[in-house]
């Protein structure tokens, strides 16, 4: 669980007021959430907006993720899912709004590297692994250790690191294939390996973009099991279009539309929402 700073409430209030002044707003917009939500959440977005060349990609987005929570994010193309993740990871800075991590850290003030070091990891839809290295070496390269490839590969692996690698390979079900080249893996297995590489960075929050895309039915089912196992010790945001996969996850769903939250709740509830049916499910 994430340890929260006892002084986070006052610090977070100062961050919000500073953002208001910085963007020239005469009055503080009404917050969607309570102060308790700000300081108790692992991730807190409130009133976040960003525009690109006059197009408002995110408009007044408010969202909280609790420590140890897995959340599914759905929405049609252009709903703002990718931009939301870009904001969380520091790739895109919002025009206005509050983005806090761990109750006290203002993510809008940090660059991508600092946010990654803080404990936010992102997995893109297309897996990126070192094809000509073994599965085990891919995990070793991702561990928090000396950063150059040569130093990492030839570094004396301590017992604790060896155990960590074994644990990760067990979680992603690739322990028996540890000596295989990553390039020989199936698409689904490469997805699992990249998730394992993300785990090697000890993230508090994982952002996972369409993990089931291009997978067989069997791989999709295994991926749901994998993410549920990971969510026992981490917070996870899953962006996905496969409703069957989301049903397997069995988690709260947030529906985005035109850059803001349209609906939230269990999948059956949001699927029955008339507005969701109209703008997302297409019937």
What is each residue range found by the language model?
Residues 23:
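Cationic, low-complexity basic patches in intrinsically disordered or flexible, solvent-exposed regions
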């Amino acid at each position: 669980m994430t340890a929260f700073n006892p002084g986070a409430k006052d610090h977070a209030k100062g961050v919000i007021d500073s953002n208001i002044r910085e963007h020239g707003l005469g009055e503080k917009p009404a917050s969607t959430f309570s102060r308790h939500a700000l300081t108790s959440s692992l991730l807190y977005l409130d009133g976040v907006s960003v525009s690109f060349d006059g197009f408002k990609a995110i408009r007044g987005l408010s969202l909280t993720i609790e420590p140890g929570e897995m959340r599914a994010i759905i929405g049609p193309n252009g709903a703002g899912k990718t931009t939301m993740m870009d904001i969380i990871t520091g790739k895109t800075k919002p025009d206005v709004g509050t983005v806090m991590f761990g109750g006290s850290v203002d993510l809008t003030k940090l660059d991508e590297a600092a946010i990654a070091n803080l404990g936010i990891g992102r997995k893109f839809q297309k897996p990126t692994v070192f094809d000509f290295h073994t599965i085990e070496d891919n995990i070793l390269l991702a561990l928090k250790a000396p950063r150059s490839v040569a130093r990492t590969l030839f570094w004396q692996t301590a017992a604790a690191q060896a155990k960590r690698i074994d644990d990760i390979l067990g979680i992603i079900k690739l322990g028996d294939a540890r000596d295989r080249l990553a390039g020989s893996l199936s698409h689904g297995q490469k997805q699992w390996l990249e998730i394992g590489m993300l785990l090697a960075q000890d993230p508090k929050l994982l952002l996972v973009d369409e993990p089931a895309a291009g997978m067989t039915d069997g791989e999709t089912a295994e991926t749901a099991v994998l993410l549920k196992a990971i969510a026992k010790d981490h917070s996870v945001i899953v962006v996905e279009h496969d409703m069957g996969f989301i049903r397997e996850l069995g988690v709260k769903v947030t529906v985005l539309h035109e850059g803001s939250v349209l609906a939230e709740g269990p999948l059956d509830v949001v699927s029955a929402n008339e507005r969701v049916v109209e703008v997302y499910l297409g019937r």
